[in-house]
From Swiss-Prot:
This is Small ribosomal subunit protein uS4. The gene is rpsD. Residues 93-158 form the S4 RNA-binding domain. One of its GO terms (cellular component) is small ribosomal subunit. CDD domains: S4. InterPro entries: Ribosomal_uS4 (IPR022801), Ribosomal_uS4_bac-type (IPR005709), Ribosomal_uS4_CS (IPR018079), Ribosomal_uS4_N (IPR001912), S4_RNA-bd (IPR002942), S4_RNA-bd_sf (IPR036986). Pfam families: Ribosomal_S4, S4. GO terms for biological process: ribosomal small subunit biogenesis; translation.
Amino acid sequence: MARYTGPRDKVSRRFGVALFGSTKALEKRPFPPGQHGMRAGRKKKSDYGVMLAEKQKLRFQYGVLEGQFRKYYAEAARRRGITGDILLQLLELRLDNVVYRLGFSNTRAGARQLVSHGHITVNGKKTNIASYSCRPGDVIAVGGKASSQQLVTRFLDLTQATVVPDWLECDRDKLTGKIARVPSKEEIAPIVNEQLIVEFYSR
């Protein structure tokens, strides 16, 4: 399955929540897109439909393909602890998401491009894999090229009001960040019910 590149507001309207940051689309049209959107919004979903929607919301939020998402769930289920919480942590520690959380980009899609185009380093080494799993102690930095630094500096102007979460350390002047620790579920503040995703895969 290819990565979704269509209108993001339509996806947010489909699920009734802003998946990609604030949007006025939900205020103007608080119902699913399409010819029968208003009627579809009033339909009661089956239990399966509710669980599927939660999975899709989380997948779209982080820009993860279906196959990748299944692998994240399998890894979360394999580890000791609360599966839903671990799933959220695995997604949150993706390199593209960390770049986004640091404010080096104003969207996850933009952060993914920064990584894939070689603008980001991890512990001093260029890393162009958006799904790279960061660990506590990892130092994330913008590459030394002037073009990389100018690009991220422009993004920082757009994200000045962004609050960097406590599990990250950020030096905006040096364009660097560090993973201080693994984030808690409360810090991630998911917009989904992750337990329903666990139930979806446990059927």
